Amino acid sequence: MRINELARQHATELDALIDGALILDSQKFGLNCDNEMAAIFYYPISIGNPFQSLYYSKFLENGIVPIGTNNLSNVASIRWPGKMFLHLHWLGNIIGDTENSDVANQRVEEFLQQIDAMKDNGFNIIWTVHNILPHDAVLQDCQIKLRVELVKRCDIIHTMCGDTIQLSEAFFSLPEDKIVNVPHPTYETFYPTQYSDLESRFQLNINHDEFVFLFFGSIQAYKGLHDLVRAFKELDSRTDKKLKLIIAGKVFNQSNFKTIKNEIDASENIALFQNRIPNEDVQHYFKAANICVCPYRITLNSGVAHLSHTFGTPVIGPNVGGFKELLSGGGGYTYEQLNFEDLVLAMEKSLTMDFDKERKKILKINQKYNPDKISSQFAEIISRGGADD
């Protein structure tokens, strides 16, 4: 997979395809074998997010060569005797950060023309709906147009939660006959997990008697950090328990963050780790925490929720999309989205949570979201070229 520094060993996407084909041929996949060989090019490559690493991890074993690309022109003209797929992920960079609608519409048209040409060349188009619209969408009409037109061209639309069709309806329609639903995986086996909860608290200088709420991941306006800080302070005023809030993640917009940072700096029991967290340190934040809070104002699927469960840490999240499905059988609490008091109540409820009981539930829940199982399931669907019956 062309998803990290190892990708440099393949000079081009075509080289990667040839190398992958040779590997599959040795495993009895190919034109002269009982098992068909396929190729899937995915766009764009997300190096900082292990989602793609996990989702494609079992593809070669299922006869599919996964190859990442950040330039569709590099793969558009490739011809292949087996099935070829273009797998689209996040669409935000197609329009980019322009605020000029004419420029945006031109970029949409150029992208769609490229997709049409790839379909003419034999590519099947797959789109994974990670979010309904980009969280920071400026030219919403252009973003909607892009998705409306892309849906028409898709052979497979991949959703990761059952709410996707309903939540999309206000902007665009998703035809059910194109949809396959395979959930977001946990991050099992990806992140190191050797340290104890006690060691993790020691590393982060957290006392054993503190009840710790965690906000983890990139700090962006739509994630509702302002709401969480307010809710934390409100709860702190209602209880005698020693509370602590850990905020760990990279800030995307410093000007938006300035106001809330003043509140954080003025609070002795809020700790801010304002950087991207190295993979080897991720475990410390979740193991030191009692519960992870995702106070998102906009959400569809949440990798952070699954990351939290990977370490056995319960989650609080809004009662929509992936959170609603993930937490329906335990492993945390949901609250009514955009309802501040309900967020406070969910956090208050967590103070008396039976954590041993919830961790047992999480272990059971994680079986459904095992990354090897998810990758194999998705690969089998792709091999069939259609919906999961």
Sequence positions of predicted segments:
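Donor nucleotide-sugar binding/catalytic pocket of nucleotide-sugar-dependent glycosyltransferases
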Residues: 152-192
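Acidic anion/phosphate-binding donor-loop and adjacent secondary structure
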Residues: 169, 186-203, 209, 385-386
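Conserved donor-binding/catalytic core segment of Leloir-type glycosyltransferases
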Residues: 207-223, 229-232, 245-246
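Nucleotide-activated donor-binding/catalytic signature segment of Leloir-type glycosyltransferases, i.e.
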Residues: 249, 257-283
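Acidic donor-binding loop of glycosyltransferase active sites
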Residues: 284-300, 310-313
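Short acidic/histidine- and often glycine-rich active-site loop of Leloir-type glycosyltransferases
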Residues: 306-307, 320-329, 333-334
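Conserved acidic donor-binding segment of nucleotide-sugar-dependent glycosyltransferases
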Residues: 329, 333-341, 347-354
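A charged, aromatic-enriched C-terminal amphipathic alpha-helix characteristic of glycosyltransferases
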Residues: 355-384
